[in-house]
Structures are given as structure tokens and as C-alpha cells.
């Protein structure tokens, strides 16, 4: 749940910091577009158009209840093109716009990643230094550092992760 957990925590913390208007943080959509991960056991993916439609219907529902500023905060790079397509679809077919960001591209998060990164050089990676650091801070019981190695499917060096880096990023 690394992608979901990191993204959801950042969304919740950001919402708590906003006083100017009400902010609704929906429960995360835990699956997305990941056909490139299917060779790795345990991966689950939606079809491209299924995921576009799921996101579209969530946005349409939220918009119907009066929320006019809709932000999709993403925690998985593979979802980025799908979110872009959904945003285009919303504008063309539903007549309203939304925003979509990867949490690691938010200015304060990106800046902190660059500062703390040893092996990743500011790159979020996949189960590498940054995601390992975030999980060590958020859910340390799920991280087994004694087996954290650079293996196929991992982009970045997880052994350089630590909870202090994760806390700074969050």
C-alpha cells in the first residue's frame, strides 16, 4: 500500500492545513493502471478505459454535490497519463475542469525529496530510497530493512531509506 498510503497521508495533511475553504479528502482508490507491473506477483491493474471511467464518475459525483475545485492527487506514476485523459474527458464531456498532480511533484515535496535524497538524486523511484523512507515513517512495521535490496522491480536503493527522511518529506 506504499503508493496509496503516501499519497493519502499527504492529502490529509494538506487538507488539515487549509482554512480558507472546506476540503473533502475521499478514501483512496487503491488500484490503478499498472499493466507494466503484471510480471511481478501480486500486482493488480485496471484496463485503461476502466480507470478513466472510474475517475470520471468520481469527479462527476463530487461535482454534483457542489465541489467545484477537484484535485486528483496521484501516488503511482503509471496513473499519470490516465489522469490526464480523464481531465480532458471531464472538460470535453462534462463541462468542468479538474487538476491532477503526482504527490512527489508538489513543490514542497519535490524540494524536500531533492534535499534528503542520497541515492535517488531527487527521483521518487519505485520501492527505493524515497518510498522506503516514507513507509519507514508512516508504517515501519511493514518495512523489513534487513532484506531491503536493489532487485528487479525496485527503482532506487531502499537500503538508504530511513524514517527521518520520510518525516521530512511528509
Residue ranges and their predicted role:
Residues 1-71, 75-170:
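Extended, histidine- and acidic-residue-enriched regions that form the cofactor-binding/catalytic faces
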Amino acid at each position: 500500500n506504499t503508493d496509496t498510503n503516501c499519497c493519502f497521508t499527504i492529502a490529509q495533511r494538506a487538507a488539515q492545513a487549509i482554512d480558507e475553504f472546506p476540503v473533502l479528502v475521499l478514501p483512496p482508490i487503491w488500484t490503478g493502471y499498472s499493466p507494466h507491473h503484471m510480471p511481478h506477483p501480486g500486482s493488480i491493474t485496471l484496463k485503461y478505459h476502466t480507470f478513466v471511467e472510474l475517475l470520471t464518475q468520481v469527479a462527476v459525483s463530487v461535482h454534483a454535490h457542489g465541489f467545484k475545485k477537484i484535485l486528483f492527487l496521484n501516488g503511482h506514476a503509471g496513473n499519470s497519463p490516465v489522469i490526464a485523459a480523464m481531465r480532458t474527458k471531464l472538460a470535453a464531456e462534462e463541462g468542468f475542469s479538474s487538476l491532477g498532480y503526482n504527490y512527489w511533484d508538489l513543490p514542497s515535496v519535490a524540494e524536500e525529496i531533492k534535499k534528503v535524497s542520497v541515492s535517488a538524486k531527487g527521483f521518487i523511484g519505485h520501492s527505493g530510497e524515497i518510498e522506503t523512507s516514507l513507509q519507514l515513517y508512516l508504517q515501519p512495521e511493514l518495512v523489513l530493512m534487513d532484506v531491503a535490496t536493489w532487485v528487479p522491480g525496485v527503482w532506487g536503493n531502499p537500503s538508504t531509506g530511513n524514517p527521518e527522511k520520510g518525516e521530512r518529506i511528509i
